[in-house]
Curated annotation (Swiss-Prot):
Gene of this entry: yihY
NCBIfam families reported in the protein's UniProt record: PRK01637.1 (NF002457), yihY_not_rbn (TIGR00765)
Family of the protein in this entry: Belongs to the UPF0761 family.
The organism of origin for this protein: Escherichia coli O45:K1 (strain S88 / ExPEC)
The protein's name in its UniProt record: UPF0761 membrane protein YihY
Cellular compartments annotated: Cell inner membrane
Length: 290
């Protein structure tokens, strides 16, 4: 009886172990950590231009003026570690200075923000090993859609959350709304990663694989936020060593680990489909044997 249970457990864990080996092999072959480092570098260069473009879009729509402030606080509270207040102050100063630029400088900001979109596109298609290239006009349209619709959708989601908060006066809905608001950042991350893994690759991505990969990435991202904030508050070694400049290495490390999580979610999405194909091919060979 015990031997039968052990055999069943071994039989069930064998596919998981094979999938994990395939995942590790792909991470190694794709140089995932190097890709994450490249994206982190480009992201830091594009951070101020990207934020400037996003909030310039909100300024063009007066109805989003209040949502713009909420979105700004939401981003720095949920997508940056515990030093988000300091980083927010610096970035807002940089963005205020960028608003004084000429038309040529503004075009430069937009180009820099689009270069970040291109780098993300290139990295994800490297992971998917897709050789097919999009037409340049179509790529530009996709990047511009992300830059324009992304912030507007985020603003709409914040408007919904504000509406939910306004319903808290109803005692019967208090617990439900609190639970919804508590998992709202996780849901937003999950949807964002799912859209990223579904739209950006130039080959078709199975929807269920993108959902699983995005969910794992969203969970890791939420865990990273809490773990990073805990580390900074409990072990303030960066502040002791760097003083007022501590925000710089903290931001560097945060952005790098965030891109590692994003690319790991992409690797998981790809590996799910590849493992399924390899398993089907092996079963087909067994069926073909006399």
């Amino acid at each position: 009886m015990l031997k039968t249970i052990q055999d069943k457990a071994r039989h069930r864990t064998r596919p998981l172990w094979a999938w994990l080996k395939l995942l590790w092999q792909r991470i190694d072959e794709d140089n995932m950590t190097t890709l994450a480092g490249n994206l982190a570098y480009v992201s830091l260069l594009s951070l101020v231009p990207l934020v400037a473009v996003v909030f310039a879009l909100f300024a063009a729509f007066p109805m989003f003026s209040d949502v713009s402030i909420q979105l700004r606080h939401f981003i720095f509270a949920n997508f940056l570690p515990a030093t988000g207040d300091v980083i927010q102050r610096y970035i807002e100063q940089f963005v205020a200075n960028s608003n004084k630029m000429t038309a040529v400088g503004a075009c430069g900001l937009i180009v820099t923000a689009l270069l970040l979109m291109y780098s993300i596109d290139s990295a994800l298609n490297t992971i998917w090993r897709s050789k097919r290239a999009r037409p340049k006009i179509y790529s530009f349209a996709v990047y511009w859609m992300i830059l324009t619709l992304g912030p507007l959708l985020a603003g709409a989601s914040l408007a919904i959350s504000a509406y939910l908060l306004s319903l808290r006066w109803a005692s019967d809905l208090n617990t439900v709304i609190d639970n919804v608001l508590r998992i709202f950042p996780l849901l937003l991350s999950w949807i964002s990663f799912w859209l990223l893994y579904s739209i950006v690759p130039t080959i078709r991505v199975p929807n269920r694989d993108a959902i699983v990969g995005a969910f794992v990435a969203a969970l890791l991202f939420e865990a990273e936020k809490k773990g990073f904030a805990l580390y900074i508050t409990m072990f303030p070694s960066y502040q002791l060593i760097y003083g007022v400049l501590a925000v710089i290495p903290i931001l560097f490390v945060w952005v790098y680990w965030t891109w590692c999580i994003v690319l790991l979610g992409a690797e998981i999405t790809v590996t799910l489909g590849e493992y399924r194909k390899l398993k089907q091919a092996a079963e087909q060979e067994e069926d073909d044997e006399p």
